[in-house]
Every structure is written in C-alpha cells, then in structure tokens.
A protein has these predicted regions:
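A domain-level signal for caspase-like cysteine endopeptidase catalytic cores
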Residues: 47-63, 140-259, 263
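Bacterial N-terminal signal peptides that target proteins for export
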Residues: 2-12
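Sec-dependent signal peptide cleavage junction
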Residues: 21-36
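Cysteine protease catalytic core and zymogen-processing segment of caspase-like enzymes
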Residues: 231-327
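Structural alpha-beta junctions
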Residues: 89, 192-204, 321-332
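Non-catalytic propeptide/linker segments at domain boundaries
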Residues: 63-194, 239
Length: 417
C-alpha cells in the first residue's frame, strides 16, 4: 500500500500537468509512433505474471481508502497517473490508455494484448431512495404482490406440481454483490423459493464465474442479475480506432491460474479485466454457444445498458445469444432502476409459469409496473429521476414459452374468467 501511494504521489504532479495540458482525453490511444504489441495466440506464464503485477497495482489503488474518498475527477487523475507509471515499467502498452468520461472508465491494454480498465465510479444501484421519494417505503415487499391471477392460482398449481415434480429449470446468475448485508439478495432468495414451489426448479448462483456463463444452455430460463456498462477501448496496430461495447461485470477476481485458463478468451477480447475482475463481452456468448448450444433457453437480463443507450441502441448481446440458439432474449436499454427491474422480472416469470409466452408475460409486467422505469418512478413519488428512461426490449420469438403442465394454464384461465 505504501509503495502504491508513493508511486501515485510521485507521478501525480509530473503526469497530471502532462495529462491536462498536452493530451486531450482520447489522445492517449493515438499518439503517433506508439503501437500495441501484436497479440499472441496463447498466454504464456510470463504474460500472466506481468498481468498479475499490473492487476496488483490497480487493485491496490482502487481498493484503498484514499481512492474511496476521491471524487470521480480525482479518481481519474490517480488512475491515469498509476497507468503512466505502469506504462514506464512495461506493464501497460504504450499508447493504449483511453479516457471515457461518459462511462467513467479508463481503459488500457496489457503488453500481451489483453484489455483492461479502471472504473472511476462504483457500479450504481439505481434505487428510489428515501431522499428522492415522497413515500420511502416503496420497495417491493416480501412476499411481493402476486397479482390476481397468480394469487388465485397459487394453491392449485402448487398442489399439482408437488405431485408431478418440476416442469422446468431456471438459474439466477446473481453477481450484483457478494450477498453479505445485501439489500437486493433477499428478494431473489424469495423468488427462488416461490418459483421452485410452483414447479420451476430455480437455483441462485451467487459466485458467478466465466465458466458458469458457458452453461446457461442447461436451463429453460437463465436470468442475468449483474451490473453492466459500456467499455471503450482502442484497437489496431498502425491505424487506431476507438470502439465501444456493452459488457457484463462479474465479481470473479482475476488470478494467475484463471488467467491461464481463460487465456484464449482474454486474448480474443471476449473477456476483459476491470479493477482486477473479469467482465464479458457479446463475443463471449457468440463463441461459447456455437452450434446452437443455447437452444430452447429464454434469457432474461437485468443488466444496465445490456442493449445500449438511447440514440445508440446496441443489440450485440441479444444477437450473440440468439445466434447460440436462445429462443428469446429480454434486456434493458439505458441504466435501469433496481426495484423496477426486479419487479418486472418477478411479474414476467410468474406469468411464464402460468403458461403465457414471453411476449405476453413481458407485456403483462409492463402493464403492471410501467412501460419504462420513469413511469414507475414517478408513480412512486420519485422527485429526482435519472436522465433517460430504461425500457425492456424482447428479441427473438415472442411465442417462446416454458413447457408448463396443463394445470398451470387451466388455473390461469380460470382466474382470468
């Protein structure tokens, strides 16, 4: 820690003058004469040792009390200063540092060609907090509101499915946090128990790894409950270009052995490393599910910016999953409010269990909670809405459905009558 602070302090004065006066934000990646080393086909042990040195310096910075106390501008200065020091030591590729002020990220490339980054802000929980609400008790309560159909049908469906066993499998890939003192996790734990009792055998993976996300095809329904963002980086050895891609953030920490294990995906930029943790891109899914390995699966993502942002919608994630055989993919444009997203998931899956197809189930959720999260936000008395409304979009077949027992559909029809 002392060495890290010393390096920051020593480099900060010298570097930040250079940063603020000589180089515009995007120029770090486009200095003439500076090119990234060509990517190798595999990672060597030497490559991984170098990356681990870089990761150790980055995580020492981002995990420090001093960094936690900084505002975003101060974090940017500290991150750039640290990366310039690492560049001088040969642990970051010259010319690869890129500032993305809009997405609060500094990206860079390791000498071996793997992509990395430093967040300037912690992933945000888009909540309706007490200070923004007329009524602070607007959180979805346990048990959540079941709606008329589910309330009426619950006992008969539960009885039927207890006799016949589960009709399908679902996994919630939960990587919002480590679940300790979590304000989110209890809701997902409740959903797991409720859906399992209704016949959809549901598991929660609270230690999601890159390897786990290659097994989503084992489920009828896979739910991605993780943070997400945009990652901006530069590519090209002689003619550099800036690219931006949506990414899914995991809590899985980078290690020497895992870097070797994931080397092929790291070099292919299907996995990147941010703040010493693994993140995945759309190409990860496209590569993992070649040959239709995701067939007959519905994917529901709660990830922020999974489908891009207003004015720059990005269907790369959805296309990658559909190319792997997924029947349908649901995701959000823009950053989505936590409670709205969770409520939409709850209502949508409940109506899938009742036998509705994904198109009808999603429309029911929108009718219940609002077409977008600002409709929901204002209905709850919110006073400080975020800049852009987040809304769910369905890709693939709107007719995709779970293979539920006839009793589920019969109960739903009886309730609706």
């Amino acid at each position: 820690m002392k060495q890290t602070k010393h390096r920051i302090l020593c480099a900060l004065c010298a570097v930040m003058l250079l940063v603020s006066t000589a180089f515009p934000a995007a120029a770090f990646a486009e200095q003439p004469g500076e090119t990234a080393a060509p990517a190798a086909e595999t990672l060597s042990s030497a490559d991984v040792r170098e990356m681990q040195q870089t990761d150790a310096a980055v995580t020492a910075l981002t995990g420090s009390d001093a960094y936690a106390a900084m505002d975003p501008d101060q974090r940017q200065q500290a991150a750039v200063a640290e990366l310039f020091v690492l560049m001088q030591e040969g642990l970051v590729s010259a010319g690869s540092i890129h500032l993305d002020g809009e997405n609060k990220l500094v990206s860079f490339s390791y000498p071996c060609g793997v992509l990395g980054g430093i967040w300037l802000e912690d992933p945000m929980d888009e909540d309706l907090d007490a200070e923004n609400a007329v009524d602070p008790s607007v959180e979805l309560q346990l048990p959540p509101d079941l709606g008329a159909e589910m309330q009426y049908s619950r006992s008969s469906i539960h009885h039927e499915n207890q006799m016949d066993g589960p009709f399908g499998k679902a996994t919630i890939y939960y990587a919002f946090d480590n679940t300790i003192n979590s304000s989110r996790y209890p809701y997902y734990s409740y959903m797991k128990g409720f859906w399992s009792a209704m016949g959809l055998e549901t598991k929660i993976n609270t230690a999601v790894t890159v390897a786990d996300l290659k097994k989503m095809g084992d489920n009828d329904l896979s739910v991605l409950s993780t943070h997400g963002s945009y990652y901006t980086y530069t590519t090209g050895r002689f003619w550099k270009r800036t690219r931006t891609t949506p990414i899914i953030l995991l809590t899985e920490e980078s290690t020497f052995s895992k870097d070797l294990r994931y080397g092929f995906d790291l070099l292919g930029h299907r996995i990147i490393k941010v703040n010493g943790h693994y993140c995945i891109t759309a190409d990860f899914f496209r590569n993992a599910y070649k040959g239709g390995k995701l067939a007959n699966t519905i994917v529901y993502s709660e990830t922020c910016e999974f489908l891009g942002v207003d004015g720059s919608e990005d269907n790369a994630m959805a296309d990658a999953l559909l190319s792997g055989g997924a029947n349908a993919v649901v995701g959000y444009v823009n950053n989505v409010y936590t409670v709205y997203s969770r409520s939409m998931l709850w209502d949508t899956v409940n109506h899938l269990i009742l036998g509705q197809n994904i198109g009808a189930a999603l429309e029911h959720a929108k009718a219940t909670y609002g077409e977008d999260d600002l409709v929901w936000y204002h209905s709850q008395g919110g006073l400080r809405p975020h800049a852009a409304a987040s809304y769910a979009v369905l890709y693939g077949s709107s007719q995709a459905a779970l293979s539920v027992p006839a009793a589920n559909r019969a109960a739903a029809l009886q309730a609706a009558a």
